[in-house]
Regions:
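Hydrophobic, aromatic-enriched interface-forming segments
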Residues: 199-288
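Small-residue-rich helix-loop
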Residues: 274-328
Length: 387
């Protein structure tokens, strides 16, 4: 476990400084067309690539979160998320006795203002069977009846059903109530790049605290964040505010969620997330906004002020170019699985025959005949959708 910790700390050292007032470092124009898999951080397009993904918490809270993860078998990538990490409501004077944590570190109590909520984690590992085997030896009490059937059964359920995440909820570690989900690293990678389910990709559209890193996941998540911006732009009018943009992005993963329709989820949840985490949304997406040629801030002088990131009273205006060719390219660059679902919906709308549809899918495939990535250029069907 020490190796990934040292690797994480060494890679974060160059990203920990506040760079909010710096211009985004230019990216190679074809970085999205390169295979999104790396074995070393030195292979990133530049040394600061993806630094927007590293959102700040205080050091004591971060150490407490890492201390919790040290109680588990080694993992390759991990993040903490949800309202237990980044608040979705105004701080209240909660009493310590109201905390769900039996005996948490002081840093967690302070971060959660004395009360707090369960802390959620996603743990990504290259081999779920090995992880569960080690974890069952350490923490058999974390598992349901499936744990009695052995790690091979648990990992089969983990990898083959649903979104590929196996959760153990309501677990106490280091005196802190947590929920943790285990996922195969390849499953996480595919969802970030292709939006197979949007379950994990959607969580990473919102502010999270990354605790352990892996270079190919950093690249994949940067693609995921950029895809979220493009998808939101296709849903937004020519002029809108940054809160409308971030609300649209946040809402992508809630589309079709029955909890939002039947009242088991707060109907103001999206607004609460954006309102209370506006600074982190700016840190996460500002450089990506600046990198897109069809998107700009209406008043660029506002973002030149050194304090704009922290000014929660601002709701900056943005504008996008609705040129059909630009919008068609955004359709073409949507994640593969999600784009195919969009194509299927529009196939029915345009009454396209089955054979014509299959030819169109083959022409728009991301891979060439040799398995390499093709340059993503809009075709006639993308242009019809964008009109």
């Amino acid at each position: 476990l020490l190796l990934p910790i040292r690797r994480l700390q060494s890679t974060q050292a160059s990203t920990s400084s506040d760079s909010s007032n710096q211009s985004p470092q230019s990216l190679p124009s074809d970085w999205e067309d390169e295979p999104p898999s790396l074995s070393e951080f030195t292979g990133l397009p530049h040394k600061d690539f993806g630094k927007n993904q590293h959102l700040e918490t205080n050091e004591e809270f971060k150490r407490s979160l890492r201390g919790i993860l040290r109680e588990f078998p080694p993992m390759t990538y991990a993040f903490a998320y949800g309202s237990g990490v980044f608040p979705q409501s105004d701080a209240t004077a909660s009493l310590v006795t109201q905390s769900p944590h039996p005996n948490p570190p002081e840093a967690i109590l302070k971060w959660q203002k004395g009360g707090g909520k369960m802390i959620d984690f996603i743990l990504a590992t290259r081999y779920t069977s090995h992880f569960h085997s080690l974890n069952l030896n350490r923490h058999k009490d974390h598992y349901s009846f499936l744990g009695k059937m052995g790690s091979s059964v648990v990992s089969h359920v983990n990898d083959k059903y649903g979104a590929g995440v196996y959760f153990n909820p309501y677990i106490t570690v280091n005196g802190t109530l947590i929920k943790y989900g285990v996922v195969n690293l390849e499953t996480l990678h595919r969802d970030l790049v292709n939006w197979d389910t949007l379950y994990l990709a959607g969580r990473l559209h919102k502010p999270v605290k990354i605790l352990f890193e892996e270079p190919s996941i950093r690249v994949a998540n940067q693609r995921n964040l950029l895809s979220a911006v493009r998808c939101a732009l296709l849903l937004l009018p020519p002029n809108f505010t940054e809160k409308q943009l971030y609300s649209t992005i946040t809402g992508l993963s809630y589309q079709g969620d029955p909890r939002m329709d039947y009242g088991s989820e707060n109907p103001k949840k999206i607004n609460n997330i954006v309102t209370h985490q506006i600074r982190n949304f700016r840190l996460l997406y500002h450089d990506l906004i600046m990198s897109l040629p069809n998107l700009s801030y209406t008043d660029t002088s506002a973002i030149s002020k050194p304090t704009w990131l922290d000014d929660t009273t601002l709701d900056l205006k943005l504008q996008q170019d609705l040129d059909p060719s630009r919008r068609a390219n955004m359709v073409r660059r949507l994640p593969k699985s999600f784009r195919e679902k969009v194509y299927f919906l529009y196939r029915r709308k345009f009454n396209i025959s089955g054979r014509e549809y299959q030819d169109m899918l083959e022409a728009s495939a991301d891979e060439d005949a040799k398995g390499g990535l093709k340059k993503q250029s809009a075709g006639p069907f993308d242009r019809r959708i964008a009109e």
